[in-house]
A protein has these predicted regions:
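Beta-strand-rich C-terminal secretin pore/gate domain
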Residues: 69, 86-87
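Charge-rich, well-structured scaffold segments of protease-associated domains
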Residues: 1-20, 56, 87-242
C-alpha cells in the first residue's frame, strides 16, 4: 500500500479539484401504473425484453435487487433456469439487474419457440416473477448467490482493469467506497422476506415496460440518401517494381 500511495502521489499528486463543477441534478421519472408496451420490427428473430424500475445505486433496494435477480436467473438454479430453460418452455430466457446512479432496472429477455407468440412468452415470464413475489423459491439460493458473487469478485480483482473499474463504478454511481467494499457482506444479510417485500413493491404485474421485437418490415424506418461515391481506379494491370 505504501508503494501504491507513492506512485499515486507521484503521478496524480499535483492535481487540484475543480470547485466550479456543477452538481448533477437528477430528475424523478414518472411512476408506471400500467404496463408500457412498444412494438419494434425488423428481420432478426422475434424476442421480448421486459423491465421493472427500482431505486438507484446508493439505495438498499439496489443490493436486494442483485440478490433477487440471481434468484430469478443465475444460469444454473434460478427460477428461470429451472422452470423455463430446463423445461424448454421457451427457446431461451435470462434476466439481470442493471444498477444506475439515478434509477435502476431489472431486465428479463426471452426468445420464443417456433409457433409460440410473444404474448405467450410474456405470460410465462410473468409467472416466474410472481413466484418471486410469492416466495416460491429455495432460500438456499440466497447464500449461494452471495458466495458466487464473492467468488466472481475475487477472480475479477486479480485484474488491474477490474480493480480500476470498481473505483470508477463507485465514483459514477455516487456510492461511498466503504459501502462498496462491504456490499457483499450486506447482501449476505438479505433474507427471503426482504426479497418478497422488494418484489411485491417493485416487480408487480402492472408496473413494467415491455418491448416486442417482431419480425417484419419496419414501416417507419427513415432511409438515408446514399452519398455519391467517387470511383477508384484499381490499376489491376499494373505491378509495383518493389513487389
Amino acid at each position: 500500500p505504501d508503494e501504491m500511495v507513492a506512485i499515486i502521489e507521484k503521478y496524480f499528486g499535483g492535481m487540484q479539484p475543480n470547485q466550479n463543477l456543477p452538481e448533477l441534478t437528477l430528475t424523478t421519472s414518472s411512476k408506471i401504473e400500467s404496463p408500457v408496451s412498444k412494438d419494434v420490427y425488423g428481420l432478426d428473430a422475434e424476442n421480448i425484453m421486459m423491465g421493472w424500475k427500482y431505486p438507484g445505486a446508493t439505495s438498499d433496494e439496489a443490493l436486494i435487487a442483485e440478490v433477487a435477480a440471481s434468484v430469478l436467473y443465475n444460469g444454473t438454479a434460478g427460477l428461470i433456469d429451472l422452470n423455463i430453460n430446463q423445461q424448454q418452455k421457451v427457446l431461451s430466457a435470462y434476466g439481470m439487474s442493471y444498477t444506475r446512479p439515478d434509477a435502476s432496472e431489472l431486465i428479463i429477455m426471452a426468445n420464443p419457440k417456433q409457433g409460440q407468440t410473444l404474448e405467450e412468452v410474456r405470460d410465462i415470464m410473468l409467472e416466474e416473477v410472481a413466484k418471486l413475489r410469492n416466495g416460491e423459491f429455495d432460500e438456499a439460493l440466497l447464500a449461494g448467490t452471495v458466495n458466487n458473487l464473492r467468488l466472481e469478485q475475487m477472480k475479477s480483482l486479480e485484474s488491474n482493469a477490474s480493480r480500476a473499474d470498481m473505483f470508477v463504478n463507485s465514483f459514477i454511481n455516487g456510492t461511498e467506497w466503504k459501502d462498496e467494499v462491504k456490499a457483499l457482506d450486506k447482501m449476505s444479510q438479505v433474507t427471503k422476506e426482504d426479497i418478497i417485500k422488494w418484489a411485491e413493491k417493485y416487480l408487480r404485474d402492472d408496473n413494467y415496460a415491455i418491448i416486442y421485437k417482431r419480425q417484419g418490415e419496419d414501416k417507419n424506418v427513415i432511409k438515408v440518401t446514399a452519398p455519391k461515391i467517387t470511383p477508384i481506379k484499381s490499376n489491376r494491370d499494373m505491378q509495383s517494381e518493389f513487389l
